[in-house]
Amino acid sequence: MVSASRPEALAAPVTTVATLVPHNATEPASPGEGKEDAFSKLKQKFMNELHKIPLPPWALIAIAIVAVLLVVTCCFCVCKKCLFKKKNKKKGKEKGGKNAINMKDVKDLGKTMKDQALKDDDAETGLTDGEEKEEPKEEEKLGKLQYSLDYDFQNNQLLVGIIQAAELPALDMGGTSDPYVKVFLLPDKKKKFETKVHRKTLNPVFNEQFTFKVPYSELGGKTLVMAVYDFDRFSKHDIIGEFKVPMNTVDFGHVTEEWRDLQSAEKEEQEKLGDICFSLRYVPTAGKLTVVILEAKNLKKMDVGGLSDPYVKIHLMQNGKRLKKKKTTIKKNTLNPYYNESFSFEVPFEQIQKVQVVVTVLDYDKIGKNDAIGKVFVGYNSTGAELRHWSDMLANPRRPIAQWHTLQVEEEVDAMLAVKK
């Protein structure tokens, strides 16, 4: 009995052990439990490291928040930039397509509109294709001039008053003009008067009077010309406009005063003599007047070969008397001579406003008399551009003032000098 029950008692524990061991050793853990263990370990490790950092907890939390914000901001910027690029590409494609269509059709559209406009014009005017269309020309407004006329029967003198001008056109770059007026009688034109130049104005007030010695019996056959010019120091003066008054249409029983509109000037048939450029300089303390003959251009052809041999004479005059005379060298075979020659005259300050400088351009001739090409004078009783040059010299002592002058017929200048003795 004892032997039989003992094996059974021994076997039971074996079976029990066999069933318990596998249950304790091989039962698998659930996925949630594994992740929780890993997170717990990581958290525990992080907290251990965090406690090692020598900062208070609130500082660590602030750093963490800033880091998170930076990461979020960077992500937002990257996403926005990507979206913006996509939109631009899309718009560019749409815009390119539209432009291509417009560029393709623009010529046809322009032709169509042009043809339509021509048809509309023809319909309005009633003209056919074979008829020529003439556009009406608007009259150019040149301004107007106020003047007065009177005759002194006792002294046989025609008195011409240049009062003022208005609404003149702007011929200079700055939107203004430098106007002055020329007055002369036709047909002789020997005696010309000029008003003073008024700078930078379109409405100059002159109030100047000029006297022509003309017998009344001859006055009816003459025509008075009043021409308004724009002064230019370094080039030819531009004519703004003019008008003519036949003397046989004027009633000299009373003083005539009226406004007249300026008309386009007729082309002058007078032969051009050329232009000369010279500078003036006056030193009051030394009483020294310096004239520098610089150059001349477009001189009249005097020789058979179509050229000239020009030189220049300078006379210092007072009361019709020649005080001193100078002359330049001769330039052979040219109509545009260059001199750059200086001449000095002693003129005391109290005499400077009483003298005249007469400049004459002549053509040298080995055989015979040297012919005068043209002449001009500045100084006492000069007018227009010549008076302006002299005034500028006096207003700027010690400074050379250069200016171009148009040469005039010698006889006309001599007549003016003779009258103004």
Swiss-Prot record:
Glycosylated. GO terms for cellular component: axon; chromaffin granule membrane; cytoplasm; dense core granule; excitatory synapse; glutamatergic synapse; Golgi apparatus; hippocampal mossy fiber to CA3 synapse. Keywords: Calcium, Cytoplasm, Cytoplasmic vesicle, Differentiation, Glycoprotein, Lipoprotein, Membrane, Metal-binding, Palmitate, Phosphoprotein, Repeat, Synapse, Transmembrane, Transmembrane helix. The modification Phosphoserine is found at residues 264, 342, 344. Ca(2+) 2 binds at residues 171-172, 230, 232, 238. Glycans are attached at residue 24. PROSITE patterns: C2. The chain crosses the membrane at residues 58-79. Ca(2+) 3 binds at residues 232, 235-236, 238. It is found in: Cytoplasmic vesicle, Secretory vesicle membrane; Cytoplasmic vesicle, Secretory vesicle, Synaptic vesicle membrane; Cytoplasmic vesicle, Secretory vesicle, Chromaffin granule membrane; Cytoplasm. Expressed in the brain and adrenal medulla (at protein level). Ca(2+) 1 binds at residues 172, 178, 230-232. The keyword Plastid does not apply. Its main location: membrane. Residues 80-421 are cytoplasmic. Ca(2+) 4 binds at residues 303, 309, 363, 365. One of its GO terms (molecular function) is phosphatidylinositol-4,5-bisphosphate binding. Its cofactor is Ca(2+). Ca(2+) 5 binds at residues 303, 363, 365, 371. Residues 135-381 are annotated as: Phospholipid binding. A lipid is attached at residues 74-75, 77, 79, 82 (S-palmitoyl cysteine). Binds 3 Ca(2+) ions per subunit. The ions are bound to the C2 domains. Calcium sensor that participates in triggering neurotransmitter release at the synapse. May have a regulatory role in the membrane interactions during trafficking of synaptic vesicles at the active zone of the synapse. It binds acidic phospholipids with a specificity that requires the presence of both an acidic head group and a diacyl backbone. A Ca(2+)-dependent interaction between synaptotagmin and putative receptors for activated protein kinase C has also been reported. It can bind to at least three additional proteins in a Ca(2+)-independent manner; these are neurexins, syntaxin and AP2. This is Synaptotagmin-1. It comes from Mus musculus. The gene is Syt1.
